């Protein structure tokens, strides 16, 4: 599957295979990270499956992925939610950030222009075991504490996704 390469301002500049984009030193490309909330304000974290080529078995946001070149992040994120968790949720883009992280265990690199989307979920997810090892609903404050205490158990992008998503959720919920 190709990913959309972007420049320093997030503008599309081309495409390449996903494996090539994640080969060291990494090519800057468009990605998305979804964080779903329940009605109590908890966030749904997933433990990435052992077969993932980047950061396997680490805890991450609800789901993430890459839109195809020219595809909207909202459409791609909705597709991934259905594929990975068997759920649908209304999604809102609430921010974007750039990061680069090398996975020393796999030799792969994430260099992403990451769009953050949030939504609420009031149904039970049905994770695909090829994508997701485990799921957990956690209060944002607890996630922050665990990120500080055990950073190696979490993906390098989770802290930034959580900050952007939680601020937007609290603002929209009047909390």
Swiss-Prot record:
Keywords from the named record: Cytoplasm, Isomerase, Isoprene biosynthesis, Magnesium, Manganese, Metal-binding
CDD domains given in the database record: NUDIX_IPP_Isomerase (cd02885)
Listed Pfam families: NUDIX (PF00293)
Residues in Nudix hydrolase domain copies: 27-160
Recorded GO CC terms: cytoplasm
Gene Ontology biological-process annotations: dimethylallyl diphosphate biosynthetic process; isopentenyl diphosphate biosynthetic process
Active site residues according to the UniProt entry: 64, 112
Chief localisation class: cytoplasm
UniProt GO molecular function: isopentenyl-diphosphate delta-isomerase activity; metal ion binding
Cofactor note: Binds 1 Mg(2+) ion per subunit. The magnesium ion binds only when substrate is bound. Binds 1 Mn(2+) ion per subunit.
Stored InterPro entries: Idi_bact, IsopentenylPP_isomerase_typ1, NUDIX_hydrolase-like_dom_sf, NUDIX_hydrolase_dom
SUPFAM superfamilies: Nudix (SSF55811)
Coiled-coil segments on the chain, per record: none
Catalytic activity, as annotated: isopentenyl diphosphate = dimethylallyl diphosphate
Binding-site residues, Mn(2+): 22, 29, 66, 110, 112
Binding site for Mg(2+): 64, 84
Required cofactor names: Mg(2+); Mn(2+)
Pathway(s) of this molecule: Isoprenoid biosynthesis; dimethylallyl diphosphate biosynthesis; dimethylallyl diphosphate from isopentenyl diphosphate: step 1/1
Compartments where found: Cytoplasm
Known EC number: 5.3.3.2
Similarity remark: Belongs to the IPP isomerase type 1 family.
Function: Catalyzes the 1,3-allylic rearrangement of the homoallylic substrate isopentenyl (IPP) to its highly electrophilic allylic isomer, dimethylallyl diphosphate (DMAPP).
Name of protein: Isopentenyl-diphosphate Delta-isomerase
Lineage, highest ranks first: Bacteria, Bacillati, Actinomycetota, Actinomycetes, Mycobacteriales
């Amino acid at each position: 599957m190709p990913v959309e390469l972007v420049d320093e301002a997030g503008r599309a500049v081309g495409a390449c295979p996903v494996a090539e984009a994640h080969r060291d030193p990494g090519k800057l490309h468009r990605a998305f990270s979804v964080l779903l909330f329940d009605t109590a304000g908890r966030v749904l974290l997933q433990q990435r499956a052992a077969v993932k080529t980047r950061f396997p078995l680490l805890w991450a946001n609800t789901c993430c992925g890459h839109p195809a070149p020219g595809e909207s992040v909202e459409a791609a994120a909705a597709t991934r939610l259905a594929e990975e968790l068997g759920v649908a949720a209304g999604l809102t883009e609430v921010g974007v950030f750039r990061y680069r992280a090398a996975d020393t265990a796999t030799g792969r690199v994430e260099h992403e222009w990451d769009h953050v989307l949030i939504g609420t979920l009031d149904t039970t997810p049905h994770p695909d075991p090829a994508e997701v090892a485990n799921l957990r609903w956690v209060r944002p404050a607890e996630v922050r504490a665990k990120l500080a205490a055990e950073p190696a158990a979490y993906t390098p992008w989770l802290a930034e996704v959580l900050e952007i998503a939680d601020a937007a959720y609290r603002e929209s919920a009047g909390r």
